[in-house]
Amino acid sequence: MNIVVLQTDICWADIEANLAKLDSMVDDAPAEAELIVLPEMFSTGFCMDAERVALPDGGEVLSWMRRKAIARSCAITGTVAVSDAGCYFNRMYFVFPDGTYRTYDKRHLFTFGGEDKVYTCGTERVVVKYKEFRFLLQVCYDLRFPVWSRCRGDYDAII
Protein backbone atom coordinates (compact mmCIF):
# COMPACT_ATOMS: atom_id res chain seq x y z
CA MET A 1 0.00 0.00 0.00
CA ASN A 2 1.25 3.49 -0.85
CA ILE A 3 0.92 5.65 2.27
CA VAL A 4 1.67 9.38 2.45
CA VAL A 5 2.29 10.89 5.89
CA LEU A 6 1.93 14.67 5.97
CA GLN A 7 3.47 16.92 8.61
CA THR A 8 3.17 20.69 8.71
CA ASP A 9 3.57 23.68 10.96
CA ILE A 10 0.18 24.34 12.51
CA CYS A 11 -1.44 27.77 12.60
CA TRP A 12 -2.63 27.65 16.21
CA ALA A 13 -6.42 27.19 16.53
CA ASP A 14 -6.94 28.50 12.97
CA ILE A 15 -8.99 25.88 11.15
CA GLU A 16 -9.31 27.87 7.93
CA ALA A 17 -5.56 28.53 7.63
CA ASN A 18 -4.64 24.93 8.44
CA LEU A 19 -7.09 23.49 5.92
CA ALA A 20 -5.82 25.91 3.27
CA LYS A 21 -2.24 24.81 3.89
CA LEU A 22 -3.12 21.11 3.91
CA ASP A 23 -5.34 21.52 0.86
CA SER A 24 -2.34 22.01 -1.42
CA MET A 25 -0.28 19.38 0.41
CA VAL A 26 -3.00 16.77 -0.13
CA ASP A 27 -3.43 17.86 -3.75
CA ASP A 28 0.33 17.60 -4.33
CA ALA A 29 0.67 14.13 -2.79
CA PRO A 30 1.77 11.45 -5.27
CA ALA A 31 -1.04 10.20 -7.49
CA GLU A 32 -0.43 6.61 -6.37
CA ALA A 33 -1.22 7.47 -2.73
CA GLU A 34 -3.81 5.06 -1.33
CA LEU A 35 -3.85 6.45 2.21
CA ILE A 36 -2.96 9.93 3.46
CA VAL A 37 -2.21 10.27 7.18
CA LEU A 38 -2.63 13.71 8.76
CA PRO A 39 -1.31 14.78 12.19
CA GLU A 40 -3.17 14.64 15.47
CA MET A 41 -5.54 17.64 15.69
CA PHE A 42 -4.28 18.79 12.30
CA SER A 43 -6.88 21.55 11.96
CA THR A 44 -6.12 23.33 15.27
CA GLY A 45 -2.95 22.03 16.84
CA PHE A 46 -3.03 20.14 20.16
CA CYS A 47 -5.38 22.75 21.60
CA MET A 48 -6.95 22.41 25.04
CA ASP A 49 -9.42 25.24 24.39
CA ALA A 50 -12.02 22.75 23.17
CA GLU A 51 -14.90 25.13 23.77
CA ARG A 52 -13.42 27.36 21.07
CA VAL A 53 -12.08 24.82 18.54
CA ALA A 54 -14.20 21.66 18.84
CA LEU A 55 -16.66 21.14 16.02
CA PRO A 56 -19.99 19.33 16.28
CA ASP A 57 -19.45 15.88 14.76
CA GLY A 58 -16.34 17.02 12.89
CA GLY A 59 -18.09 19.90 11.12
CA GLU A 60 -16.28 21.59 8.25
CA VAL A 61 -13.10 19.58 8.87
CA LEU A 62 -14.83 16.25 8.35
CA SER A 63 -16.53 17.69 5.25
CA TRP A 64 -13.11 18.75 3.94
CA MET A 65 -11.67 15.28 4.61
CA ARG A 66 -14.57 13.63 2.80
CA ARG A 67 -14.22 15.94 -0.22
CA LYS A 68 -10.48 15.28 -0.40
CA ALA A 69 -10.87 11.50 -0.09
CA ILE A 70 -13.44 11.44 -2.88
CA ALA A 71 -11.45 13.79 -5.14
CA ARG A 72 -8.21 11.84 -4.60
CA SER A 73 -9.85 8.40 -4.63
CA CYS A 74 -7.86 7.48 -1.55
CA ALA A 75 -8.42 7.16 2.18
CA ILE A 76 -7.53 10.03 4.53
CA THR A 77 -7.13 9.85 8.29
CA GLY A 78 -6.36 12.31 11.09
CA THR A 79 -7.80 13.56 14.36
CA VAL A 80 -10.09 16.49 15.04
CA ALA A 81 -11.33 18.13 18.24
CA VAL A 82 -15.07 17.42 18.24
CA SER A 83 -18.06 18.10 20.45
CA ASP A 84 -20.54 15.28 20.71
CA ALA A 85 -23.34 14.65 23.21
CA GLY A 86 -22.12 17.40 25.54
CA CYS A 87 -18.53 16.13 25.65
CA TYR A 88 -15.30 16.89 23.80
CA PHE A 89 -13.30 14.16 22.06
CA ASN A 90 -9.99 13.91 20.24
CA ARG A 91 -11.61 11.94 17.41
CA MET A 92 -9.83 10.13 14.63
CA TYR A 93 -11.67 9.95 11.33
CA PHE A 94 -10.74 7.29 8.80
CA VAL A 95 -12.40 8.46 5.60
CA PHE A 96 -12.68 5.97 2.74
CA PRO A 97 -12.38 6.97 -0.95
CA ASP A 98 -16.18 6.96 -1.30
CA GLY A 99 -16.57 9.50 1.55
CA THR A 100 -17.87 7.06 4.15
CA TYR A 101 -15.93 6.99 7.40
CA ARG A 102 -15.24 5.30 10.71
CA THR A 103 -14.31 6.99 13.96
CA TYR A 104 -12.09 6.27 16.93
CA ASP A 105 -11.96 8.41 20.07
CA LYS A 106 -8.51 8.61 21.64
CA ARG A 107 -8.46 6.30 24.65
CA HIS A 108 -5.37 7.41 26.55
CA LEU A 109 -5.44 11.15 27.03
CA PHE A 110 -2.16 12.99 27.63
CA THR A 111 -2.33 13.98 31.30
CA PHE A 112 0.86 16.06 31.21
CA GLY A 113 -0.71 18.30 28.56
CA GLY A 114 -4.02 18.58 30.42
CA GLU A 115 -5.90 16.69 27.72
CA ASP A 116 -7.65 14.55 30.35
CA LYS A 117 -9.12 17.68 31.95
CA VAL A 118 -10.79 18.80 28.71
CA TYR A 119 -11.49 15.79 26.54
CA THR A 120 -13.38 12.58 27.22
CA CYS A 121 -11.53 9.33 26.60
CA GLY A 122 -12.85 6.80 24.14
CA THR A 123 -13.89 3.32 25.18
CA GLU A 124 -13.90 1.33 21.94
CA ARG A 125 -11.08 -0.44 20.15
CA VAL A 126 -11.57 0.15 16.41
CA VAL A 127 -10.14 -1.92 13.56
CA VAL A 128 -10.75 -0.65 10.02
CA LYS A 129 -10.51 -2.85 6.93
CA TYR A 130 -9.17 -0.97 3.92
CA LYS A 131 -8.07 -2.73 0.77
CA GLU A 132 -6.14 -5.82 1.87
CA PHE A 133 -5.21 -4.46 5.30
CA ARG A 134 -6.81 -4.24 8.72
CA PHE A 135 -5.70 -1.14 10.63
CA LEU A 136 -5.99 -0.68 14.38
CA LEU A 137 -6.75 3.00 14.93
CA GLN A 138 -4.74 4.71 17.66
CA VAL A 139 -3.73 8.26 18.47
CA CYS A 140 -0.31 9.32 19.72
CA TYR A 141 -0.20 8.54 23.46
CA ASP A 142 -2.29 5.37 22.98
CA LEU A 143 0.91 3.62 21.84
CA ARG A 144 2.32 3.93 25.37
CA PHE A 145 -0.24 1.39 26.58
CA PRO A 146 0.60 -2.00 25.03
CA VAL A 147 -2.39 -3.82 26.52
CA TRP A 148 -4.63 -1.53 24.45
CA SER A 149 -2.69 -2.19 21.25
CA ARG A 150 -1.83 -5.83 21.82
CA CYS A 151 -2.25 -7.87 18.67
CA ARG A 152 -5.18 -10.22 19.02
CA GLY A 153 -4.82 -11.35 15.43
CA ASP A 154 -7.47 -8.85 14.37
CA TYR A 155 -5.22 -6.27 12.67
CA ASP A 156 -2.22 -6.05 10.35
CA ALA A 157 -0.89 -2.58 11.22
CA ILE A 158 -1.46 0.33 13.60
CA ILE A 159 -2.24 3.84 12.37
Question: At which residue positions do the language-model features occur?
Answer:
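Extreme N-terminal starter segment of soluble prokaryotic enzymes
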Residues: 1-5
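Structural motif
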Residues: 34-35, 135, 157
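Short, acidic/polar
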Residues: 17-27, 143-150
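Short secondary-structure boundary/capping elements
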Residues: 17, 57-60, 119-120, 144
